Amino acid sequence: TRHGGNTIRAYPALVDKGSSVSIRLFGTPHDQAVAHRAGVRRLLLKAIPSPTGYVQEHLTTQEKLVLAQSPYRTTAELFDDCMIACIDAVVGDAEPWTRAEFETLRDAVSATIVDSLFETVALVSRIIGKGRDADRAIRGATSMALISPLADARSQLEALLYPGFVAITGARQLRRLPVYLDGLIHRVDKLAENPSRDRVWMAEVQAASDRYTAAGGSLPLQAGAEARVIHARWML
């Protein structure tokens, strides 16, 4: 539109309002894309029957116990985040702007959501279990000489597991978290053998992390981060 002889550009997008969606104008295509993806996701969550209750009923007792100790405030919030991760895995970079495009996505999500949620919840249960193992390993290392590397290990753990980590990490990268957590446990177990070696490695990682944050990255990742930032984060 034009105002006072100037051209004003605005980019419309669906906006996630929690229990509903609205339309809002944004100043940049990037902000538009981030908001629109979240808005489409919310519409999809409202448009498909949720299999959450069914999946919860079929969890093993062990899975229920592990999931109850997640970093999320409630198990319901954890399952909501798992649903979002499952939907994002189907939607990908698609940006539906018409009813037909949205209905195509809705049908694709509906066709896979039950199996996808089962798989995601089972994986998240493994991840949380390994996170507990990592926490125990860190707590069990009590040498005063290891305070700095143990604090670094704690920081790494908290950058992997936090409220919202499932959807922000995404279904594809979630599969790598057990490997990262195993590596963290191995690091803590081996700290006492050669703390000098660990300090060298820690300094190298810190230097890379500093460059990452200077370029706009954050630990943990923030929702809506640019693709280049996401790629760089998982290179650390």
Spans of model-derived segments:
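Acidic, serine/threonine- and proline-rich low-complexity intrinsically disordered segments
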Residues: 1-209, 217-220, 227
